[in-house]
Each structure stands twice: as C-alpha cells, then as structure tokens.
Amino acid sequence: LPLLASVTTSSATLPGLFPPPPVSGLPPFSIIKEFDTKTATKEVAPEKPKETRLICKGCSNEEHLALEFFQDAGIKDRNALATIMGNIKQESTFRSSVCEGGSITSYYNCGRGYGLIQWTSADRYYGLGDFAKKYGGSPSSLNTQLRYLTNEVQWQRIAEKMKSPGKSINRYMDYAYSWIGWGHHGNRTRYAYDYLNKFATKTVEVS
C-alpha cells in the first residue's frame, strides 16, 4: 500500500481556533442605560400664615411706628386705633421730646408735662424715668415711651376695652379719658376721624 502523504498544517490554516481580528468602527448596537422611572419629589415649604394690618397713608414715621406698636399690642379695631392716635396727636403731635408749652428738650430738662401723652403728675412723670432706668432706653425716645405707656396702670385698666372691637369712636374716647385724664378735649375726636380716613389695609406674613 502506498504510504499516506504527510500533511503539514499550521495553526494559521486551521479554522475556528482564534476569534477574528477586531473590526474598526462603531459596534452594531448601543448599550442603553436603565432609565430611572422614579419621579423626584420636590419638597414644598408650607405657606406662611398671613394677617391684615392697618397702615396710615400720608403719616409720619412716628405715626407709623405707633400704629404698628398698638396693633402688636392686640388692638385691631379701626375706631379704637384711630382714637388712640387722635389722642396722642392732640397731646404731642407724636413728638416724644416735647415739653409742656411746646419746647423740644430732654426728659431731664422738662420737669412738667412731657412726651407723647404729656405725663404731668409726679408719679407718672417720674415713673417714665424709672421705667427707662429699669428696662433700658431713653425716657425721651418714642420706643421707650410707647412701652411705658402700655405698662402704666392707667392703660392697663382700659386695655381690654380697647381690644374689644365694634364700638364707636365716641365710646373709645370715653375709655381714653380715664387713661389720659385730659383737661381740654381739643381736637381729639376730629383727629380720630382724620386717622380713620387715612387708614388702609395690607396683608403681611406672620413671623
């Protein structure tokens, strides 16, 4: 029998032993990342409570501060606020450093009716100075006098009545007399109605 011819093969000629060489260019498919279907929840801050406040159109800075102060003290009725404002205007035109007679001076140089509501009697006049020493502030300043005013026993006696809504200016004026104890009514009532006409409302956030 004839000898079988030997066949020499190399690995290069054997099919399927190695993968084909890489092909340049883009792959035939793209890898898509998994889409996050969860919806992000945006935290919404709760709306701050609001309230209606009175402002005074065409009024001075001192008048604005006083109106804010009495509203903060719990007085909300228009007529009550107008009555208080009218009385302070009659007494001092909101000049906290006015001395009886009209001169502008410090508390220590007056010695008689002084300030927003012309504190005259010894106990009320010196009470203002004592209050300033005890709690801080100048006895000639608007802020100190407003704080003193609402801490006086004369005010405390009528405070709840002034906070009670729905009364006429004349009724609130009766309460104010026992608070201030004026000797001359003057233009208090007219000033009160003037303020009533100057009042307007605004909505503010409650802090």
Per-range role (PLM):
Residues 1-25, 31-44, 125-207:
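Non-catalytic cell-wall polysaccharide-engagement segments
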Residues 45-65, 92-166:
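Peptidoglycan-targeting cell-wall enzymes and recognition modules
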Residues 64-68, 72, 82-85, 147, ...:
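Solvent-exposed, polar/charged alpha-helical surfaces in well-ordered, non-transmembrane soluble domains
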Residues 74-76:
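Extracytoplasmic/periplasm-facing segments of secreted or lipoprotein envelope proteins
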Residues 79-95:
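Short, functionally critical alpha-helical segments immediately adjacent to catalytic or ligand/cofactor-binding
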